[in-house]
Amino acid sequence: MLYTVFCDESCHLQKDNSSVMVLGAMYCLSEKRKQIYSDIRAIKEKHGLNSHFEIKWTKVSESKIEFYLELLDYFWENSDLHYRGLVATGKDKLNHAKYNNDDYDLWYYKMYFRTLDPIIRQENEYHILVDIKDT
C-alpha cells in the first residue's frame, strides 16, 4: 500500500529560546488524500476562510474557534487519518559535541527518524512530505 505522510515541526531552531521541539506526522493511504483535502477545504470555506490558507495552530483565535473545533472533530472522526507526534524536551541542554558530532541538524534529523520509524512498514511504500526547515 502507498501512504502519504505529512510532517511538520514546531520550535525546531537551535536558538529559538525554547527548550522543547515538537515533530508531528499525519498520514493516510495516498488514495484517500484527495478526499481528505477536499473535506478540509470545505470546512475552511464553511467558516468563511480561504480554502488554500495554511492552518497554523499558533494562530488559533476566539474568532476562528468554531473552525478549529470542527477541524479537530474531523481528525478524530476520520479513521483514514493517523497521527504520530514526538515531543523532545531539554533541547537547550543537549551536548551536541558529545552525541551529535557537534551538529544540531544531526540531532534534528535523528528526532525525525524517531518520529517516523514506528510508522514505516517494510511492506508499504511512502511519500514523505517534510515541511521546509527555515533557518
Where are these regions (language model features)?
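Phosphate-ester processing/binding pockets and catalytic centers
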Residues: M1-T135
